[in-house]
């Protein structure tokens, strides 16, 4: 397991060896020797795991390795931090800088030679302890080979493997949909041990077409062991999907739970609703929720999932408690073979016999079976016996526990994949994780190495897909064939947390205890009080500080906590900064965090960035989403490493060349016109936001050609009220020479369509998602899509909420849009006449 850390440090040493400063100081050779020794030790660690050595001697040796790996990282990072700090100083400090540089150079030479002596001592101890030999692999980088294999793999399957729950689904659907007045079951509780499939069953019911049609509105929330009633209520309100984003921001400011209860009660009163409350551990959680849910016997239902029978049967007098059973062997085998044999062309009797022996020992627990099958699906057939033998050595009570299967799966991961999985321990229990954010964090942490053929973000996505394929992570939401959000089962999360603690990988803040001095990351899930962040012991070796959770009123962050100089990741989403009594300004001290790669200030009300932001030349991601628009000039031109800029920059936004830029959401048309579009070759996600409230004097004529110059552009959103779209290039937005070879999603908001734009748009070769929101059809009465048009389009959404010229008719020819699965026409367009093929009528939604 420690190999995850040593592998990471080896990659970091490799990056520093490229720096010519080390060669000038005469320390490069020493660092090369250090790397060679650590590479050998990295291999010995794999040997310790392979031989399943768990004796005290091996544990002590691996602890020594972990300590020195972290010390190597600290020495290198601290030295280069000082170099960067000195490079920012000018004028009278020049002489002091020269003296300081000489002192720093002397110190790092001594530090590296001390580390070299320590690592040689560790090597001698290995021989004394009798830890086995290691043959370093030759040839092409294993990680690169595996990443390319993943790239060629089929896309993630959206269909969840649900076996043995068919009867449960039928029984509970009857309960949910029944009109029988004698059936007073307002609450349905599903209970059973962890890993049986309670959430999977509830999700199956929640997504049922019959259920969607029966209820006016639905909501899903989770509770978990550490819960706050406030967070649960906010999640229910958001999940209902009937409250605007602006209203949600106001709701988050409610100070008392009672205010939220009254608000939710008002939303649901008179409606036929369904609410799923997942993973309840404490009966008080339901008691605090039920006051907010009207029980007027209009057919509304609440589904509760829990491991505890007393909660399932005792929540209410009208409860129907449904106990989940273990799978039969036949069901277990069906679940297993669907995944385990998916990559095997021919399954012989010996392989079946070996598989059945292992499945029997899983005792009918679905989670253990899917993790085991995920492990074996990646093994060659001759390796199955090795897995079986290893399982037999680890049997507990003559059965395979989920922890046993997980240990085997984790053990054989490459170190990069181990780090990615351990990062799931950062997130709260039952938390829905946005994959885009997770990818940005993994890259910023330095866990991802660039492949010859792929960008780091694509490599990170491959790792997440592999964890999904191994059944260690659940794909929650999928769009355009990509996992957009995911979740980890709480049992697997517990195992990830256990391993993360052993490695000092992360500490989840607890006001009763402090993390160790070498812990690399600290994460806060709940604020105990608003000012707790102001008065805390600072761990100067920390690389990441994250607040992840629901915003609870106002959480203040004192600027003294922003002086952790080695930070690579700072995520303060949902908190407020205290900076000279101005809460919408990021403190100047942020410019001292020159190692920073990720700055998350979403939902913080920050709308002004200080000039010191220019010091963050290694910054890769700036996430200011959910904040008020940045009205003043924002200068990011010196941030040459920027890959992702997220926020509403309505004033002038200076980007520089932007050669590394992949995400730009969102800037004004004026700022876009100032960029050199030819240099934006890596840009994949672009949003232009022009609104009369902010940019009357800054609006400039645009042409679709400017958007087509970044050839890798996949997502384009234009929110430009009252702008016109036609085939003429002299208009504000023209469709002349449209050429988007990679575009997958196009959203137009507030655009005036002067003519039928579909003939031009339907030629986009990879377009899967087209949204026309609040568009004005002033020059169009009939919009038509011809045969063969939109060959890959899966979703077409047309809506109009404000007053304007609507559309009389939408015509779709017989062979058009062969891939379509969703056609939405809503708002003032509900009266639009649809002339469409019969095959598409099942996909139409008018709401």
Curated annotation (Swiss-Prot):
A biological process from GO: defense response
The keyword Nucleotide-binding is assigned to this record: yes
Residue intervals of the NB-ARC domain: 143-453
Coiled coil regions in record: 24-41
Binding of ATP, residues: 192-199
Molecular function GO labels: ADP binding; ATP binding
InterPro entries: Apaf_helical (IPR042197), Disease_R_plants (IPR044974), LRR_dom_sf (IPR032675), LRR_R13L4/SHOC2-like (IPR055414), NB-ARC (IPR002182), P-loop_NTPase (IPR027417), RX-like_CC (IPR038005), Rx_N (IPR041118)
Keywords for this protein: ATP-binding, Coiled coil, Nucleotide-binding, Plant defense, Repeat
Domain of life: Eukaryota
Homology family: Belongs to the disease resistance NB-LRR family. RPP13 subfamily.
Function: Potential disease resistance protein.
Domains as described in the record: The LRR repeats probably act as specificity determinant of pathogen recognition.
Name of the protein in question: Putative disease resistance RPP13-like protein 3
